[in-house]
Amino acid sequence: MFNKLFNLLTGTKKEKNPADSSRTDMPLSRDLQRQFVRSYIEQTASEREGGIPNGVYETSIVSFVFNHEKIEGSSLTEWQTRTVFETRDTVLADSTTPGNVRETANHTKMFDFLFDSLDRELTPEFIKEIHLQLMAGVMDVPGQWKILGNGVGSVITARPEEVPSLIDRLVTEYNKYEPSLENIVRFHVRFETIHPFPDGNGRVGRAIAFRECLRAGLIPFIVTDASKETYYASLDEFRAGTTTSLISYAEAMQVDFVTTIAPMLADRSLSDSLLGKLGIERPNFKDDAGFVGPSTKSLKSSLESVENSGSEIKSDHKTLRTRRI
């Protein structure tokens, strides 16, 4: 599947989006990112098919679902999210919020759907399919554009009658240009501003960004609940015309993803190359004390190349600093 995917991506040359800048704080080259994505997709498929636990597949799907649900107010813990993934059940005996469980179960299925459809180009109908996967059994009409107005704080979103044409235009413009992180981030901001569905827009938008990174051979990123304030502030800054903050945030989350996944890659040589480029030491075992920490160097030190002016992102096990303009 991966070879077919990259043949599709490289078979037709697309022009660079003139709005893209040349700036980047990403310490990993495009070639190394592409190698990572190839290895990650292949290992995810193998672990998923073989039912192998505690690998890159389980780690990434639990992090993806837990964080993107938590951001939206889910009360489920990471342990409960993992239980839903392992059992694929929509009922948890210790949960008082069955709606959260249903959406979490749907979210795990949606994650699999993203991988199963990597060879499909992004279209309005495909976006509706993602929403259907997420909101089936939760909404009366999942997978359909909104018919009533909605809002996101002070952000003015599209009117229902405007949604079809705006999404068509957005997707057409996105597919016109060669894939880049900046193009993906730009799509994400515009999609969230349109807010085409009654509910689930944030989760669908972040799912699209994750998938499109994989399709482009770029390291994907997960928006963590711990960093959501920086994420939302960066979205607002992007809408106001300052694009660098959100792009730097996405790059920091890309590094966070690699830092978590790289030590588990079956390709040890690639794993060492990735960790070496980031200045992160490989985790070590002690025969009398078990596993000892992810690294003696924090992700903060590995991200010295990401220039910052003071905003902090806290993750479960590390602290990042990203540029805020």
Residue ranges and their predicted role:
Residues 1-199, 203-325:
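FIC/Doc superfamily catalytic core
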